[in-house]
C-alpha cells in the first residue's frame, strides 16, 4: 500500500505541472493584466513597463510559469492587483467554501444513498419510477433557477432562513446554499446507487447471505451496499473538487465570499494572479481526492489489493 501511494504521488507531478501550465496559459491569454488594472484609462507607458517588470510580465510565458512555480514552492502565490497577497485571500475564502462543500457532500451522500437504496430495492415499482422522474427534473433545472427559487421561498416569502449569508458563514446559514449546491450531485448519487443496487441484488453472494438466514438489514448494509458503493465513491471523490470550483453560482446567489466569489471577481477584473492561484489549489484538491478514492476501493472491496 505504501509503495502504491508513493507511486501515485509521483504520477501526480506531471499531471499537476501539465494542468497548471495549461491554466496559466489560458488565463494569461485572456488579455493584458496591466491594461485591465487601469480599466478604461490608458496607462502611462513608463508606468505600464514598471508594473510589467514588477509582476514579471515582461518575460516569456514559460519563464513566467517557472517563476510562478518557484513562488508556489516557497508558499507565495503572488499578489492580487489590489495589493493584497493571494494567500491572504485564500485564508478567508477557502474555509468558507470548505464548510459549504462539507454541507453539500453530507447532504448528497446521506440522502442520495438512502434514496438510491430505496429505489434500487424497489426497481420497476412506483417509488422507483417517481424517484427517477424527480432526479431527472433536478438534473434538468439549472442551478441558478433552483437557487433563486429556494432563496425566494425559504428566505423571502416564508422567512425560515436568511436570504443571504453573513460574513461569519455559520453551518446553519450554509444549510440552504448547501442544498442548492448539492441538488444535482444528489440526483446523480441517487441514480448511481440505484443502478448499482439493482445489479448487485441479484448477485450470488446476496443469495447466499439470505439463504444463511442473515437479517435483511445486515444483508443490505454489510454485503449489498458495501459492494455497490464503489461507483458512488468514485463520483463523490471527483465531485468534491467540482463542488468547490463550481460553487460560483451558489456563492453569487447567497452572497458568500468564498472560492467561487473570488474566482468570479478575478475573472471579471482579469486579476490573473488570483485566478491562477485559486485554480492551482483546486487542482491539488482534485488530485488528492482521486488518490483517496482509490484507497477507499480497498476498504469497500477486500478483493482489491494495491501492491
Stretches found by the model and what they are:
Residues 15-66, 154, 158-174:
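Hydrophobic alpha-helical transmembrane segments of membrane transport/permease proteins
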Residues 3, 7, 39, 50-53, ...:
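Short amphipathic alpha-helical coupling elements at transmembrane boundaries
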Residues 2-3, 92-127, 143, 167-307:
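Alpha-helical transmembrane segments of integral membrane proteins
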Residues 52-62, 76-87, 163-170, 189, ...:
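Membrane-interfacial helix-loop-helix junctions in multi-pass membrane proteins
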Residues 21-29, 66, 70, 133-162, ...:
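Membrane-water interface segments at the C-terminal ends of transmembrane alpha-helices
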Residues 6-15:
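N-terminal signal-anchor/signal peptide hydrophobic helix marking the start
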Residues 15, 122-137, 141-143:
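Small-residue-rich alpha-helical segments with characteristic i,i+4
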Residues 58-113:
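An internal, D/E-rich "acidic patch" concept
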Amino acid at each position: 500500500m505504501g509503495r502504491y501511494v508513493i507511486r501515485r504521488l509521483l504520477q501526480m507531478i506531471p499531471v499537476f505541472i501539465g494542468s497548471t501550465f495549461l491554466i496559466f496559459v489560458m488565463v494569461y491569454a485572456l488579455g493584458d493584466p496591466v491594461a485591465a488594472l487601469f480599466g478604461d484609462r490608458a496607462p502611462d507607458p513608463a508606468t505600464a513597463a514598471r508594473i510589467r517588470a514588477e509582476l514579471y510580465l515582461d518575460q516569456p510565458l514559460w519563464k513566467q510559469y517557472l517563476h510562478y512555480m518557484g513562488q508556489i514552492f516557497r508558499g507565495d502565490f503572488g499578489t492580487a492587483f489590489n495589493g493584497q497577497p493571494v494567500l491572504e485571500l485564500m485564508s478567508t475564502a477557502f474555509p468558507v467554501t470548505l464548510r459549504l462543500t462539507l454541507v453539500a457532500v453530507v447532504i448528497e451522500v446521506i440522502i442520495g444513498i438512502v434514496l438510491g437504496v430505496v429505489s434500487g430495492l424497489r426497481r420497476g415499482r412506483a417509488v422507483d419510477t417517481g424517484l427517477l422522474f424527480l432526479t431527472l427534473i433536478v438534473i434538468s433545472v439549472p442551478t441558478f433557477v433552483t437557487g433563486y427559487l429556494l432563496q425566494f421561498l425559504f428566505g423571502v416569502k416564508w422567512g425560515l432562513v436568511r436570504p443571504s449569508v453573513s460574513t461569519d458563514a455559520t453551518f446553519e446559514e450554509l444549510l440552504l446554499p448547501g442544498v442548492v449546491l448539492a441538488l444535482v450531485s444528489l440526483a446523480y448519487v441517487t441514480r448511481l446507487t440505484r443502478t448499482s443496487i439493482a445489479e448487485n441484488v441479484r448477485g450470488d453472494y446476496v443469495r447466499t447471505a439470505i439463504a444463511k438466514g442473515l437479517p435483511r438489514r445486515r444483508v443490505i448494509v454489510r454485503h449489498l451496499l458495501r459492494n455497490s458503493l464503489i461507483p458512488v465513491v468514485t463520483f463523490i471523490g471527483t465531485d468534491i473538487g467540482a463542488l468547490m470550483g463550481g460553487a460560483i453560482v451558489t456563492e453569487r446567489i447567497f452572497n458568500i465570499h468564498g472560492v467561487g466569489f473570488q474566482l468570479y471577481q478575478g475573472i471579471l477584473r482579469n486579476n490573473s494572479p488570483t485566478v491562477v492561484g485559486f485554480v492551482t489549489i483546486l487542482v491539488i484538491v482534485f488530485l488528492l481526492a482521486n488518490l483517496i478514492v482509490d484507497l477507499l476501493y480497498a476498504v469497500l472491496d477486500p478483493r482489491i489489493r494495491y501492491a
